[in-house]
């Protein structure tokens, strides 16, 4: 019975280590936040749970036009900051009033891509 307990504890520890090692990257925080109503931001920050691989990660911003069509916002620079955990898009031109959609793709050291999107409004 003691041997079964030891074997069970070892298996549980191995499963825990495996699940931690295989945890995928996740979005922790966004600025502006989803569904926020804000004035024109100078940048958009997406904070992730671990370091990103820049060449495989991206952030795109679109304005939603009348009728629902999305038009990509040009003239933004995307970089990694905060020890590679934050994907920042710096906006070179002020954004006008409207609804904006952020689409992102994040890849961590495990090379597994995670994607997402959210919207915010500028009044």
Language-model features and meaning:
Residues 1-9, 13:
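Bacterial N-terminal signal peptides that target proteins for export
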